[in-house]
Amino acid sequence: MNKKDNFVNIFDTSIASLNVGDYIIMDAVTKQLSTISNLPQTVTLPTHDHFGREGRRLLSLAKYSIVGGTNLLSSHVTQYRQWRFRMTDLLFLKKCILMGVGWWQYQDKPDRVTKFILKHILHNEMLHSVRDSFTLKQLHSIGITNVINTGCPTMWDLTPEHCCNIPREKGRRVLFTLTDYNQDLSADALLINTLKRHYDEVLFWPQGSEDIHYMNTFSTDIRNGLKILRPSLSELNANLMLKETDYVGTRLHAGIRALQLRARTIIIGVDNRAIEKAKDFNLPVLKRDAILELENMIVEPL
């Protein structure tokens, strides 16, 4: 057997990540890949850190590489690069297949350097899957057309049958999130106070490493009565699985995890990822600039 038939690389966005959302993504990627009966052995490589000598060797030997679920594409790779590779890595970084990958944020058409790099990196025969229509259009604009919009792998099991079992009526307790890098003190204070008015128990789960510091910038009156959870995926899972627990918050993948666990969910859209998913897949998203509508969404059946 040819060495290149022996294994495939999986770019793992949870390696060296301080965002638990990346673990939610990779959990779904791993689950979906496990359904492929003839998938060879898999080897994980980071997206948040550069490759060493062994990483480059694995890239050169693998049959292909799968990039799972994260929003690491951007229009100007020389200015902003979520995917941490050096230009010299392009000698090895080839035949990558996108698996529910998205665009960093709303941007213009990719520049010439980015077009060259993406055409070099991405497999030109295999079909790529992306998170949303915006990412699809961005790739089409530079001539990469072997792409379909499947949504993020975290959403692939959110079938109509699954979603029918998600409560439509408000629960007794709520788990909420905030986003440290996309702050709006006024809107987020309104979010917290609205939750405190309508729920018996209000739990804050920090998905990112700086979310708790953002929470601590709010006044004592706003923070009073909140229960702070540990920033771990197991803590999130355990609390979302408790009966009559809703999810409301700005963290997209915490919201998708809530839907996976059949919790009533309202995602507050603060960037292109949630907003584009709502357009394409009817995800329950309320734009943050419409936060005054949250109260009605909480009390009325979803």
Where are these regions (language model features)?
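Active-site anion-handling motifs in enzyme catalytic cores
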Residues: M1-L302
